[in-house]
Amino acid sequence: MAAYASRWRTDCLLRLVFKKTRLSKQVCCEVCKASRGCSTTSTGHTSTSAPWPVYGRLVTHYDSLVHFGSLRKDPQQRTALLQLEELTRVLTDYTNIPILLPQPKDCLQNQPTSELQDKVGSRETVNICRPDENVSNEKEDQQEESSKPHPPQGYYIYGNVGTGKTMLMDLFYSFVENRRKKRVHFNGFMLDVHRRIHKLKQSLPKRRIGKMTMYDPIFPVAMEIAEETCLICFDEFQVVDIADAMILKQLFEGLFKCGVVVVATSNRPPEELYKNGLQRAAFVPFIGVLKEYCRIVSLDTGIDFRTREMKPAGRLYYISSEPDAENAVNALFEELAFRQNDVTRPRVLNVQGREVTLSRTCGTIADCSFQELCEQPLGAGDYLEIARCFDTVIIRNVPYLQLGMKDQARRFTTLIDNFYDQKVRVVMLADAPLDRLLDQGQMTGEEARDRLMLDELGLTDEASKRITLFTADEEIFAFQRTVSRLAEMQTEQYWISGDRSQS
């Protein structure tokens, strides 16, 4: 009877807490289960532990793939997996809900977004600034922080192109038995963050003279994401946009403090993120935050495993100067379209209220030109929508990509990154072989004008190298990854994995 009364009091207390904090129903249910000694697993069962031993399964599976020839043995990959395997064990019973529960009394910024929106809806004055004069409240918050459970450290895995980072991420993510996990491409994640920020700002009352208050939506957005997931896996963590660079520290500090575990892969070590970027000094503190909450693992094996001998899927890359190259691509489109239950027609995709027109499609096949995809003002969100609608995309008239074509080169790199991540099959008709598609030679007219401007400003060569606007370091670095990925996308294994007709 005493045990029953204790459980009843616990449930009443939790209901009172959630009435005040207004966390989501999903979060409330998970905390109630946790209070009864249960843990939620990805299979939907509730038990005191995972239904099978997790430790040992990940590396054993990797060893079996090596044994049967699916993967090539690599000591650095195995060492990284040993570390990730321990994290899979910890994450099985991990939840960040207890970290989200304590609410500071003096700072609306740390309240869930739903309560913030309720206050906005009632036209109450919103003030998220901590009172500087209330030192005692700050001490109380520090005590609350120290009493919170500490989340496990995440991982930041970096290395050259083709060293197996994405493969390790695939293995790790598939073996994590926690249904509150999420895997996203970094570009797509940041697009979603900016959408959330915009939506939150739009929900605020109009500013009036004399009633203006400072408001920063980044932390509420971080809390909103933390309510949805306790593990985020990022593939291709890269920072090239100043709008992203300026909010990363605050965003990720919020995620980490809300108990979100981050596992990321990147081609760059943390110190080289946003290298030569505009206003990089404001970005540098993020590197310290990343190192505090994530273990850094190098995977520089010096081997591009994507270029190893793999059975090709047939001819998928054509050079426009070759005889009958265009006819061959036309024939391939007709062959693929014949299997579709559709007619060849233009198609208009709606992306965030904008229209993206593709002139020639048939079912899940899109026949596009480089001009359609990379010379229009398109971004990662547009390419993700194309990847969602089509499993095979033909890209025609891909030119020599000169260093002066920064916008086109960046869009092309983003396009291939998103297609690769979504297993979209690509057929290309280009002006140059794949390994020579990026022309790093002759200076273009745009670059010549930039150089003249630098001379007129009296900037030294050393100073000019630090100005990302006039350099192509990021484009060259990113394009190496693009070439490696396109090489893998021409293999039979990739082509079969991208076929959605069987799904």
Swiss-Prot record:
Q: Which UniProt keywords apply?
A: ATP-binding, Nucleotide-binding
Q: Name one GO biological process term.
A: cilium movement
Coiled-coil residue spans: none
Hey, what's the signal peptide range on this chain?
Answer: none
Q: Which GO terms describe its cellular component?
A: cytoplasm; mitochondrion; nucleus
**Residues annotated for ATP binding in this entry:** G159, N160, V161, G162, T163, G164, K165, T166
Annotated segments matching region Disordered? 108-155
State the disulfide connectivity: none
Q: Which GO terms describe its molecular function?
A: ATP binding; ATP hydrolysis activity
The record's annotation in Pfam families points to:
AFG1_ATPase
Q: Where is the composition biased (Basic and acidic residues)?
A: 130-148
Which family is this sequence assigned to?
Belongs to the AFG1 ATPase family.
Record NCBIfam families: ZapE (NF040713)
Q: What is this protein called?
A: Lactation elevated protein 1 homolog B
Q: Tell me the name of the encoding gene.
A: lace1b
